[in-house]
Amino acid sequence: MAKKLKKNEEITKKFGDERRKALDDALKNIEKDFGKGAVMRLGERAEQKVQVMSSGSLALDIALGAGGYPKGRIIEIYGPESSGKTTVALHAVAQAQKEGGIAAFIDAEHALDPAYAAALGVNIDELLLSQPDSGEQGLEIAGKLIDSGAVDLVVVDSVAALVPRAEIDGDIGDSHVGLQARMMSQAMRKLSASINKTKTIAIFINQLREKVGVMFGNPETTPGGRALKFYASVRLDVRGTTQIKGTGDQKDSSIGKETKIKVVKNKVAPPFKVAEVEIMYGEGISRTGELVKIASDLDIIQKAGAWFSYNGEKIGQGSENAKRYLADHPELFDEIDRKVRVKFGLLEESEEESAMVVASEEIDDLALDLDNGIEIED
């Protein structure tokens, strides 16, 4: 019996060696024909963690789970009219430029407001802008920019406005069934590999349509077929909720709106998280507003009554004054922002911060011992 088992092991080992040799030969032939790196073991890749770029909104970075938009992936932002889709995309453009990258904006709707983009922090002198005559032209331009490897972010606004050339050349009323869907499907097949290879972030803004005759379920759908839904690694549903009223002389005027951004699809982190932001008219997402709210919930900023304080120092009475204080003190804003990101695991804690946390815990333990009447030895 023992001899039989030993013989079986020898056969298995010999067969395994032959398979390994055959695999090595196949890999060598593939590298010879298609170049080094055409096939590799997953663990051999230099970067296994997904690289991200901040969305420009702290709340959205937290909802995305990875700390921002994944590089080399396709993002779809959709929602009703005037919900803030372009605003969310422009914040990503501003963030890409802030990090030293180059951004391009394919304005198929021919509706980009340069003054509003500048107010959101976009450097309009450095922004690459294209207003294509047809959908094919817009997607071709986006493809060439991505293939160059020199562009970090490409925004297409919007998929619904990417009109096929045949539809433009035809008459109003002509039927063009599935033409746009086929165009988008072909574009996704061509662009997806290049986007991943060049680590470009491609954001597609989309509108909403309603399916006719739907009795049960959600009648809403996005134009452009199903291809974008499949190829997108992240899909964001942007919807405005309640109006934000002003104070003082503007108490009867609407100065912004509360907006919910739901992550309905996420291939790099758990989906279905919701980011609640304030979009102020003419200013975009209130970064100080979301920081005050999130930091207060984490007790990084302490709230006592109407007063907000940080590290024992009062920063404002009421949220509006606290927001204004942080806007006037960018160093403090960055410090609190970093602490929040570390808390959610979006950034690694530095050695100095770890030492400060340990010291703070020791002080708290000492204070607790004194309160309990315990003698502290010298």
UniProtKB/Swiss-Prot annotation:
Q: Name one GO biological process term.
A: DNA recombination
Q: What is its main location?
A: cytoplasm
**InterPro entries, A to Z:** AAA+_ATPase, DNA_recomb/repair_RecA, DNA_recomb/repair_RecA_CS, P-loop_NTPase, RecA-like_C, RecA-like_N, RecA_ATP-bd, RecA_C_sf
List of residues binding ATP: 79-86
Q: Name one GO molecular function term.
A: ATP-dependent DNA damage sensor activity
Please name the Pfam families in this protein's record: RecA (PF00154), RecA_C (PF21096)
Task: Return the SUPFAM superfamilies for the record.
Answer: P-loop containing nucleoside triphosphate hydrolases, RecA protein, C-terminal domain
Family matches, as Gene3D superfamilies? P-loop containing nucleotide triphosphate hydrolases
Ordered alphabetically, the record's keywords are: ATP-binding, Cytoplasm, DNA damage, DNA recombination, DNA repair, DNA-binding, Nucleotide-binding, SOS response
Query: Is-annotated flag, keyword RNA-binding?
Result: no
Spell out the CDD domains in the cross-references: RecA
One annotated Gene Ontology cellular component of this protein: cytosol
State its location(s). Cytoplasm
Q: Its function?
A: Can catalyze the hydrolysis of ATP in the presence of single-stranded DNA, the ATP-dependent uptake of single-stranded DNA by duplex DNA, and the ATP-dependent hybridization of homologous single-stranded DNAs. It interacts with LexA causing its activation and leading to its autocatalytic cleavage.
Q: Give the UniProt family note.
A: Belongs to the RecA family.
Q: What is the protein named?
A: Protein RecA
- The species is Streptococcus pyogenes serotype M28 (strain MGAS6180)
Gene encoding this polypeptide?
recA
